């Protein structure tokens, strides 16, 4: 149970000064102490990466597991009647050391997975899975928890009541009420899924790195900016110099670099490398056997728990409640989207035929290129024209941080004295308007071979008043870093990603909860993306935009005409962005609405994907899923199984919240304080629909503004 609680972070993420030092920290004979097992002496109790060695993690996990086992044994050996204090609270506190070690280690497995970290992960995961099964199916422990839930729940108040409910239902959903035979099978399923997810997590980054496209001459890169060409050269050097240049593949199906790449054959190679990265085209990189087995085990798990499918089992704890409601929501969007997507594709192809001839057939690897040319012609704008105004440092300090200062009264001070796990990382002390420190924030914005694709937020330490712990939060992105001495310039999409991930960070940093289990982003998947998507809205608010969108050389604000054209371009041909998300969402649901007998073999999985998309009217080579089955890390390696819809679902919530802010004052600190008090600070201490209603006054979300906000 604590295993699940620890790792369901975003993306997935304190002062430890009052956290008790583990009894396992001391080493005999005055030998070096494992820094993961002793209280950090750094400000805020931050993890001391200058002292932590890769060899420290495995013994630290072993000590944390041993300590939690001992604490669980104390709970079940207690002869006194079960109470909130001696059972629920004791369980909440049973894994403090393990939480601390896990939060640091799993930050590295995603953002800086060196061979040493990868090897440690192989050894750690089976230990954690065994512990999770051991605790989840400990009948003596569950009997005590159930007794408190049955006899004390209605007498408890506030967070004590909520914590009791969350812990009890967590055990039930893990299978604590199953028969002994079904419990044993559930343990086997959990263990195998954990092993398979680790395999997927190792194979996919390797497949993505293997899928790079090598380029022999600079001429082949025609259309790219000097900075992009320099990045291709730098990437080639870091990946072995098999050719003078290379194009790395990012985590999504479409590749942004195709926007400017003139060489059609090279565009085709890049696109094909992306979609075939892990489907067995190269026999060493085939995730189909892994994902089909995970899908089958999840389907069996859902049925063991009394549900027809895994989707219904998983969705019960969300705002959506079941697969039927999600499918109805998606169909309402598809109905509006489909004709616009067809018209958009015809429009782009007709434009391309003007220069390429009437027989030219638009291919998926052409779409970004001709759409960009069309946008430049119609709006007279391109990424190369606007990127000089988006220096990553200015976006962070004068945009992301400035918006948080204006709306929530937060201040940020860089702490160069606090060590990090990589030189690219920065650390900031966050304080409120009174000057009181409330959090540490780490940013790690640049891609490297040891980092998986995408962007995410998580925590080195979650907030907890009961543990005397302030939050230590981090954001990770994958922006291409400029050569030494040059400023890193990013695209508008990357600007929005920084605002998005910082929305998650605010959810973690502004948390004010008693219990670790309930704090920060520990909310339903179809609510957790709301604060992040809402925070994106600040990127284009004039007072914020003008503050960070400054020319990297002159410091001049973006000219009004360019700004107007850029903002108009945000929703230029918007069907693609919605379509790729709809397709990925429906693909996720299709896999998790199958019964065990319906799961296709690895050899038929590709055909199943096409059939699933065709069934909902989304089989469209021009608008492929944002992630296809073989590289859908959110679903097979992360916590979004049957939950990828939450990005669209929460976008509806975010539009409603943004509309409320716009109506009452987008940068009004009073409105920001209300949002902080009623939503961001509350964690999972209250039903999320109630939080939404408390802030907006709406009884339920209104989807009418969603398509309008999307430009559709």
Could you tell me what each predicted segment is?
Residues 27-232, 661:
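N-terminal helix-rich structural modules
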């Amino acid at each position: 149970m604590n295993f699940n609680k620890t790792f369901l972070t975003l993306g997935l993420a304190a002062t430890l000064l009052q956290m008790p030092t583990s009894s396992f920290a001391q080493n005999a004979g005055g030998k070096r102490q494992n820094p993961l097992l002793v209280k950090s002496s750094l400000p805020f109790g931050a993890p001391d990466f200058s002292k932590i060695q890769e060899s420290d993690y495995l013994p630290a996990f072993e000590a944390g597991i041993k300590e939690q086992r001992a604490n669980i044994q104390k709970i079940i050996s207690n002869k006194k009647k079960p109470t909130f204090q001696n059972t629920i609270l004791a369980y909440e506190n049973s894994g403090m050391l393990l939480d601390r070690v896990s939060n640091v280690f799993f930050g590295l497995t995603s953002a800086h997975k060196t061979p040493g970290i990868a090897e440690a992960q192989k050894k750690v995961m089976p230990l954690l899975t065994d512990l999770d099964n051991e605790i989840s199916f400990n009948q003596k422990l569950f009997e005590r928890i159930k007794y408190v839930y049955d006899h004390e729940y209605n007498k408890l108040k506030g967070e004590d009541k909520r914590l009791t409910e969350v812990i009890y239902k967590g055990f039930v959903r893990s299978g604590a009420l199953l028969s002994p035979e079904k419990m044993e099978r559930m343990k086997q399923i959990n263990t195998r899924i954990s092993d398979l997810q680790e395999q997927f997590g190792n194979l996919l980054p390797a497949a993505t790195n293997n899928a790079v496209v090598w380029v022999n001459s600079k001429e082949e890169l025609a259309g790219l900016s000097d900075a992009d060409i320099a990045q291709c050269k730098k990437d080639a050097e870091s990946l072995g110099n098999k050719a003078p240049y290379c194009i790395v593949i990012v985590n999504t199906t479409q590749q942004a670099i195709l926007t400017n790449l003139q060489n059609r054959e090279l565009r085709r190679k890049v696109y094909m490398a992306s979609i075939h990265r892990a489907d067995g085209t190269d026999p060493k990189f085939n995730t189909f056997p892994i994902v089909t087995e995970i899908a089958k085990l999840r389907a069996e798990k859902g049925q063991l728990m009394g549900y027809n499918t895994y989707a219904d089992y998983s969705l019960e704890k969300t705002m959506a409640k079941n697969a039927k409601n999600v499918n109805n929501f998606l169909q309402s969007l598809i109905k509006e989207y489909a004709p616009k997507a067809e018209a958009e594709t015809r429009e782009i192809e007709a434009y391309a035929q003007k220069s390429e001839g009437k027989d030219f057939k638009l291919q998926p690897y052409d779409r970004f290129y001709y759409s960009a040319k069309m946008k430049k012609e119609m709006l007279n704008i391109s990424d190369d024209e606007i990127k000089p105004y988006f220096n990553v440092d200015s976006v962070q300090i004068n945009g992301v941080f400035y918006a948080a200062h204006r709306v929530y009264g937060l201040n940020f001070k860089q702490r160069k004295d606090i060590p990090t796990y990589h030189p690219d990382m920065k650390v900031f002390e966050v304080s409120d308007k009174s000057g009181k420190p409330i959090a540490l924030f780490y940013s790690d914005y640049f891609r490297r071979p040891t980092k998986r694709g995408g962007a995410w937020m998580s925590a080195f330490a979650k907030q907890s008043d009961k543990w005397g712990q302030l939050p230590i939060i981090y954001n990770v992105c994958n922006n291409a870093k400029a050569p030494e001495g040059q400023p890193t310039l990013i695209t508008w999409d990357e600007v929005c990603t920084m605002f998005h991930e910082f929305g998650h960070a605010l959810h973690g940093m502004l948390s004010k909860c008693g219990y670790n289990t309930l704090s920060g982003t520990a909310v339903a998947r179809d609510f957790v993306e709301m604060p992040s998507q809402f925070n994106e809205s600040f990127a284009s608010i004039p007072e914020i935009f003008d503050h960070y969108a400054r020319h990297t050389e002159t410091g001049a604000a973006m000219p009004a005409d360019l700004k107007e054209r850029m903002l108009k371009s945000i929703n230029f041909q918007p069907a693609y962005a919605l379509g790729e998300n709809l397709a990925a969402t429906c693909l996720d649901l299709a896999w998790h609405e199958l019964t065990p007998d319906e799961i296709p073999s690895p050899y038929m999985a590709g055909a199943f994907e096409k059939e699933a998309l065709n069934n909902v009217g989304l089989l469209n080579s021009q608008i492929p899923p944002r992630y296809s089955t073989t590289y859908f890390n959110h679903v097979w390696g992360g916590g979004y199984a049957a939950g990828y819809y939450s990005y669209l679902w929460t976008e509806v919530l975010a539009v409603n919240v943004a509309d409320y802010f716009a109506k009452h004052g987008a940068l009004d600190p009073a409105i920001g304080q209300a949002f902080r008090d009623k939503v961001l600070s509350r964690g999972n201490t209250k039903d999320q629909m109630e939080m939404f209603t408390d802030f907006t006054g709406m009884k339920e979300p209104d989807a009418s503004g969603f398509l309008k906000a999307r430009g559709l």
